[in-house]
C-alpha cells in the first residue's frame, strides 16, 4: 500500500504542462525543463506564509431543489473556502485548475499568499471537479467554457451572498490558474455584461492559449514511453518499482520535496521517463 501511495504522490506533483520549463535566461536552479516541472519550486525559493489564517469552509446551495442521485448522498453542496481579513479589504475569487478541489495544494498556497497581501479570499473548485459537477453545473457536463463560466459566476454570487454580512469589501477581483485561468477570462467577460462584481483586476496564471494544443502536447509526452502509449501499464509498474525501492532503502521519513529533489540529484529516471511520467498525470 505504501508503494502505491508513493507513486500516487509522485504523480500528483507532476504538473502536466511543459511550459513550466526552466529557462537558463533567468537563473532557475534546476536546468532541465522536465525536472523543473516535476520538482517544482525549490524550498529555498519558496516565500514564507503564515501557518494558519482566519478561514472557514463554505457549503453553497448553488442549485436549490436539485435532485441528486442516491449514490451522491454524501454531497451536501458546493465546497468553498473563505479566508477573511478583520478590516475592509479587496476580495478575490480563486478558480482551481483542471479537476482540482477548493482546497488543492496550489489553491491553498495562493490563498495564503493573497491573504498575506491583504485580500479576503474565496476559493472555488474546478468545474471539472466532481463536487462542482454534482452541485453547481447546470448541464452536469462540463467542458464548454461559456457554460462553465455561467456556473462559476452563479457560485460566486451564492458565496458572496453568504459572507457579505461578515466582511467589508473595497473591490472584487478574480484569479484562476491553468484551466481555471482560461475560465477566469470567460467569467470576467460575463461580469462585463451582468455587472454584479465589476471585477477590478483579473489574473490568469498559466492559462492554456489553446486547450487542443495543450492536450496534443501532453499526449506527445506519452510517445516517449518505451513502446509508446500502449505500454503505459508496463511503464507505470517500472517507475513504481524504481520509486518504491529508492524510498525503501533511502533515509527518508516522508514523501516530500526533499525526497523528490533527492531523486533528481540521483538521476533516478531518464529524460524520456520524466516526460512519460508528466504525460501520465
Task: Kindly give the residue locations of the regions a language model identified.
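Short, surface-exposed "cap/lid" segments of acyl-processing enzymes
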Residues: 83-130
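Short beta-strand immediately N-terminal to the catalytic nucleophile in serine-hydrolase-like folds
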Residues: 174-176, 205
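Gly/Ala-rich beta-loop-alpha elbow adjacent to hydrolase catalytic centers
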Residues: 176-180, 184
Amino acid at each position: 500500500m505504501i508503494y502505491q501511495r508513493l507513486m500516487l504522490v509522485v504523480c500528483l506533483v507532476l504538473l502536466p504542462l511543459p511550459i513550466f520549463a526552466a529557462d537558463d535566461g533567468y537563473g532557475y536552479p534546476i536546468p532541465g525543463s522536465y525536472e523543473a516541472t516535476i520538482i517544482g519550486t525549490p524550498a529555498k525559493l519558496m516565500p514564507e506564509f503564515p501557518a494558519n489564517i482566519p478561514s472557514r469552509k463554505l457549503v453553497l446551495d448553488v442549485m436549490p431543489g436539485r435532485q441528486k442521485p442516491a449514490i451522491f448522498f454524501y454531497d451536501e453542496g458546493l465546497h468553498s473556502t473563505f479566508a477573511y481579513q478583520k478590516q475592509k479589504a479587496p476580495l478575490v475569487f480563486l478558480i482551481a485548475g483542471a479537476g482540482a478541489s477548493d482546497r488543492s495544494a496550489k489553491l491553498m498556497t495562493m490563498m495564503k499568499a493573497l491573504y498575506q497581501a491583504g485580500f479576503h479570499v474565496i476559493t472555488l473548485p474546478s468545474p471539472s471537479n466532481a463536487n462542482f459537477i454534482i452541485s453547481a453545473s447546470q448541464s452536469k457536463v462540463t467542458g464548454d467554457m461559456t457554460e462553465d463560466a455561467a456556473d462559476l459566476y452563479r457560485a460566486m454570487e451564492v458565496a458572496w451572498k453568504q459572507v457579505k454580512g461578515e466582511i467589508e469589501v473595497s473591490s472584487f477581483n478574480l484569479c484562476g490558474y491553468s484551466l481555471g485561468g482560461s475560465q477566469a477570462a470567460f467569467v470576467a467577460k460575463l461580469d462585463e455584461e451582468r455587472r454584479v462584481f465589476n471585477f477590478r483586476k483579473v489574473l490568469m496564471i498559466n492559462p492554456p492559449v489553446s486547450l487542443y494544443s495543450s492536450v496534443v502536447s501532453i499526449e506527445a509526452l506519452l510517445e516517449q514511453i518505451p513502446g509508446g502509449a500502449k505500454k503505459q501499464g508496463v511503464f507505470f509498474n517500472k517507475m513504481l518499482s524504481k520509486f518504491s525501492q529508492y524510498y525503501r532503502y533511502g533515509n527518508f521519513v516522508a514523501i516530500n520535496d526533499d525526497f523528490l529533489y533527492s531523486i533528481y540529484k540521483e538521476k533516478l529516471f531518464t529524460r524520456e521517463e520524466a516526460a512519460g511520467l508528466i504525460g501520465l498525470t
